Amino acid sequence: MAKTKERKALKKGKAAFNLIGRVKVTDKTFNLDNSYDSGWTDNSMYVGVDCGNGNTVYAEMRSGFFPDKDNVIRAYSKDEKDDAGKSKSVEIAWEDRLDESLYDSISDSSFLTVGVEKDVKDKTVYKKFLTAYDAVEYLNEHLEDGMIVNVKGTIGYSEYEGNVSTKKEITSIVLSKIDDEADFKATFSQTILVDSKSIGKKNDDKGTMELVAYVIDYVGKPKIDGEKIEVKKNVTYPKTFEVAINENPEITAKMLQRFFKPKKGKITEITVTGNLVEGGSTVNITEDDIPDDIKELIEMGLYSEEEAEKKIAVGNGNRERRMIIVKPDITYVGTGDDRKPTVAFEDGKYDEDDLYFYEQALLDAGAE
């Protein structure tokens, strides 16, 4: 009897975003002390950042607790290591979460960072929070519409009825030192998997190539038909990206051939960087794009050329949520004098049979 090949464990890589722009605070941005039938109570923030040219990207913060239960916060120790050499996991009682005397022993990666106030010396005041529940409550008091902020966070993926959703969770929101809209941005860095058929069709209108790839994310205990199913594994999600075509198309063609086209049956891992586009276009509007009737308004002095171009940029936008890959990311390997830069790329890291999809993970966990 032939021996069944053991599936190689999937390793989650990078999944991060960075937004710089004007924050958009409305009466729907915050939802405090929202209660559910289960008793769960949470605070949430769903906020947009105008990153220029009508490109408003949304991200969120959310967490809560059960008022009638003993709630704990899981964090990581700053100094203690486990048997694998990783930061040791620690538990903090919910009622101790604001006790700053505990903070010195906790790893910086366990905190959410907020800096949206200035002191009397015009210096940004930074606050650390162990929970989004408290960070959102603070931001509700201090975050103001129109502030120029620098937002960082992680990108998460989930699947429901065959549709893959993307969620951007904020880990840091602080005042930005940038004040020129030309320097606003919405970028991401994401580890993806590609196979021999990932490269899709060219879209001349958008100036991009389709890339049908995969991402890896952790699934804990999803609720299926009202019951929690224990998966606790990294799983694969299909995800379609776009690849920006360079002004010199040969550069893009060479990049795709070198990094995005593994041998048949093999899966390549690569970390890429790119731009997030939501609700607007990142194209630059010039005088040639201004319609004649709007040019008349400029001639009358009712609009400046710059104002008109901004209006047109917004009007030309769409409500798609696009992740447009620009190039491979560069990472560093080694330590000390041996530390060196390298492309974050591993050709043929997995076989096609190693891909472990969400639906299969649910079946293996006992879901019907």
Locate the predicted segments by residue.
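OB-fold and OB-like single-stranded nucleic-acid-recognition modules
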Residues: 1-368
